[in-house]
Amino acid sequence: MGEPGKRVGIHRVRCFAKIKVFLLALIWAYISKILSGVYMSTMLTQLERQFNISTSIVGLINGSFEMGNLLVIVFVSYFGTKLHRPIMIGVGCAVMGLGCFIISLPHFLMGRYEYETTISPTSNLSSNSFLCVENRSQTLKPTQDPAECVKEIKSLMWIYVLVGNIIRGIGETPIMPLGISYIEDFAKSENSPLYIGILEVGKMIGPILGYLMGPFCANIYVDTGSVNTDDLTITPTDTRWVGAWWIGFLVCAGVNVLTSIPFFFFPKTLPKEGLQDNGDGTENAKEEKHRDKAKEENQGIIKEFFLMMKNLFCNPIYMLCVLTSVLQVNGVANIVIYKPKYLEHHFGISTAKAVFLIGLYTTPSVSAGYLISGFIMKKLKITLKKAAIIALCLFMSECLLSLCNFMLTCDTTPIAGLTTSYEGIQQSFDMENKFLSDCNTRCNCLTKTWDPVCGNNGLAYMSPCLAGCEKSVGTGANMVFQNCSCIRSSGNSSAVLGLCKKGPDCANKLQYFLIITVFCCFFYSLATIPGYMVFLRCMKSEEKSLGIGLQAFFMRLFAGIPAPIYFGALIDRTCLHWGTLKCGEPGACRTYEVSSFRRLYLGLPAALRGSIILPSFFILRLIRKLQIPGDTDSSEIELAETKPTEKESECTDMHKSSKVENDGELKTKL
């Protein structure tokens, strides 16, 4: 009876003992981790408004993922290869699920979301306090009552999101370095670029799902089910609107946990691809045994770890590749993270629509670029030198094309007393704001309240009171204000809730912006595979896992963590009006100075990415100096067969005896 069960168990293990099955499981792991990451990036604006925090704190929350990753990335990358790599990937996916669940907790621990407003949703009487009434005292000032102020502790709930994102970053750590090294170790060298290309294309399902789920949740009110949405005086286009961000994180938690299950069934090692087809499994077993014996003869795992690190630090091509990666991430991360905010404030669309358009236009072009690039690398057998040249040319083309976005400008939304005068004359960003005018001085209005209305004269006002409106009709978001003294010059003196919409010319420029984005993403993804192959092939086989981990470490330390924080702080400097908390403290930014925001959003990343050109030329020069036998086939390129530089020779001499012992094994493996 035990024999059939044993056969079933062996058959089940054999089903998972294939590199292509592992590739499929790794694709789903990439999809789940990218789904969580993309969804987080689409919800940053919602979190900013939910917790009434600045953009710099939002950047800190976003960077906390990299902090978690940074804590363990180097040790996972190196020591993970000594352990069971598939199981470590499975544990990482489960930990990511836990992090997503913790992120969603504040919704269940906080009370209902209260947006800044003075308007009662059912008010339609001319005596309401938010309207213009002569000789009235300001009874709606921000409270200074300690009992009320203590409620503002709810805004500190963003710390749960911070901690959850750190845990999510820790869980994500083993997936890329251990997954890529597992494929590199057990796949044919000529199939490796294709498999990585398939992986890059397959993982694009993650952004597609994330960009679909983001707008869906953003259009649902955060407290849906517990409030009557008909009574809301805000819509998804309002900068105070908060979508149901917590729903998506619960979905991501479940997906990550389910994704972890298959990895617990993969073996620690696989037969080298091609050997099992030739019946040469015994040769692979001997090679594995020889490799294990060599490891046992090492003086110690810690010493080997530091020797490999020294090897990598003495590799000039590797270090230049790391430098270009850091500069690239500094530029690209800022563009990706804050693109929804830029589209919302520059082109006047809702956050949900911005997220949907980003996914619709960018995901297909990136997928096509990855697939075409991987296919070309395999079929044409691009050499290392040609791959470096192709990557640099494509990257420079993408950078130059992105500069065209500077020409696509929309006018700043006219807001009386903020961006324009009450006569409609545009004001400079540096000018002192004058919220009061002759038409509303008698109303004794609050000047910090953000309840924007759009007059039929095309000018927006910060509140119905500042527009001089004396009467309101209707309820909820359909409320109309009448008898507005500041609008009477146009012949009709009514206003509706919300900022005025941008003109059709701005909508056309949005389309041009998105089309340019499509081509930029396509060129960027085309350059990724050849650039990544240069990075992989500049290391020895046994150094790749640690090299990938070190690269990820530096990218997170010098780009992933600081970039969203300093960029968010710079964006805060372009804020025109801050929301107000109950105790009078500033909350989330309600509107930005569009021209300054545009110059910052497009200019700083362009400068950072443009600085990559210099180290890229040095990489090309170093590659051309290398004497690579048989550089006609990319599968034959390994640094161990090249002529080392003077600096590499100096570093190698310190552990020459160790290298001699393993030289025969290394050549057999290569």
Swiss-Prot record:
<feature type="glycosylation site" description="N-linked (GlcNAc...) asparagine">
    <location>
        <position position="492"/>
    </location>
</feature>
<dbReference type="InterPro" id="IPR002350">
    <property type="entry name" value="Kazal_dom"/>
</dbReference>
<feature type="compositionally biased region" description="Basic and acidic residues">
    <location>
        <begin position="640"/>
        <end position="670"/>
    </location>
</feature>
<dbReference type="GO" id="GO:0035264">
    <property type="term" value="P:multicellular organism growth"/>
</dbReference>
<dbReference type="InterPro" id="IPR004156">
    <property type="entry name" value="OATP"/>
</dbReference>
<feature type="topological domain" description="Cytoplasmic">
    <location>
        <begin position="1"/>
        <end position="20"/>
    </location>
</feature>
<feature type="topological domain" description="Cytoplasmic">
    <location>
        <begin position="185"/>
        <end position="203"/>
    </location>
</feature>
<keyword id="KW-0597">Phosphoprotein</keyword>
<feature type="domain" description="Kazal-like">
    <location>
        <begin position="433"/>
        <end position="488"/>
    </location>
</feature>
<feature type="transmembrane region" description="Helical; Name=3">
    <location>
        <begin position="87"/>
        <end position="111"/>
    </location>
</feature>
<dbReference type="InterPro" id="IPR036058">
    <property type="entry name" value="Kazal_dom_sf"/>
</dbReference>
<feature type="topological domain" description="Extracellular">
    <location>
        <begin position="225"/>
        <end position="242"/>
    </location>
</feature>
<feature type="topological domain" description="Cytoplasmic">
    <location>
        <begin position="537"/>
        <end position="545"/>
    </location>
</feature>
<feature type="topological domain" description="Cytoplasmic">
    <location>
        <begin position="81"/>
        <end position="86"/>
    </location>
</feature>
<feature type="transmembrane region" description="Helical; Name=11">
    <location>
        <begin position="546"/>
        <end position="571"/>
    </location>
</feature>
<feature type="transmembrane region" description="Helical; Name=4">
    <location>
        <begin position="156"/>
        <end position="184"/>
    </location>
</feature>
<feature type="topological domain" description="Extracellular">
    <location>
        <begin position="406"/>
        <end position="513"/>
    </location>
</feature>
<dbReference type="GO" id="GO:0009410">
    <property type="term" value="P:response to xenobiotic stimulus"/>
</dbReference>
<dbReference type="InterPro" id="IPR020846">
    <property type="entry name" value="MFS_dom"/>
</dbReference>
<feature type="glycosylation site" description="N-linked (GlcNAc...) asparagine">
    <location>
        <position position="483"/>
    </location>
</feature>
<feature type="transmembrane region" description="Helical; Name=6">
    <location>
        <begin position="243"/>
        <end position="267"/>
    </location>
</feature>
<feature type="disulfide bond">
    <location>
        <begin position="439"/>
        <end position="469"/>
    </location>
</feature>
<feature type="topological domain" description="Cytoplasmic">
    <location>
        <begin position="268"/>
        <end position="311"/>
    </location>
</feature>
<feature type="modified residue" description="Phosphoserine">
    <location>
        <position position="634"/>
    </location>
</feature>
<keyword id="KW-0813">Transport</keyword>
<dbReference type="Pfam" id="PF07648">
    <property type="entry name" value="Kazal_2"/>
</dbReference>
<feature type="topological domain" description="Extracellular">
    <location>
        <begin position="41"/>
        <end position="59"/>
    </location>
</feature>
<dbReference type="GO" id="GO:0042168">
    <property type="term" value="P:heme metabolic process"/>
</dbReference>
<feature type="topological domain" description="Extracellular">
    <location>
        <begin position="572"/>
        <end position="605"/>
    </location>
</feature>
<dbReference type="GO" id="GO:0042632">
    <property type="term" value="P:cholesterol homeostasis"/>
</dbReference>
<dbReference type="GO" id="GO:0008206">
    <property type="term" value="P:bile acid metabolic process"/>
</dbReference>
<dbReference type="Pfam" id="PF03137">
    <property type="entry name" value="OATP"/>
</dbReference>
<feature type="modified residue" description="Phosphoserine">
    <location>
        <position position="635"/>
    </location>
</feature>
<dbReference type="GO" id="GO:0006805">
    <property type="term" value="P:xenobiotic metabolic process"/>
</dbReference>
<dbReference type="GO" id="GO:0006811">
    <property type="term" value="P:monoatomic ion transport"/>
</dbReference>
<dbReference type="GO" id="GO:0022857">
    <property type="term" value="F:transmembrane transporter activity"/>
</dbReference>
<feature type="transmembrane region" description="Helical; Name=7">
    <location>
        <begin position="312"/>
        <end position="333"/>
    </location>
</feature>
<feature type="disulfide bond">
    <location>
        <begin position="454"/>
        <end position="486"/>
    </location>
</feature>
<keyword id="KW-1133">Transmembrane helix</keyword>
<feature type="transmembrane region" description="Helical; Name=9">
    <location>
        <begin position="382"/>
        <end position="405"/>
    </location>
</feature>
<keyword id="KW-0406">Ion transport</keyword>
<feature type="topological domain" description="Cytoplasmic">
    <location>
        <begin position="624"/>
        <end position="670"/>
    </location>
</feature>
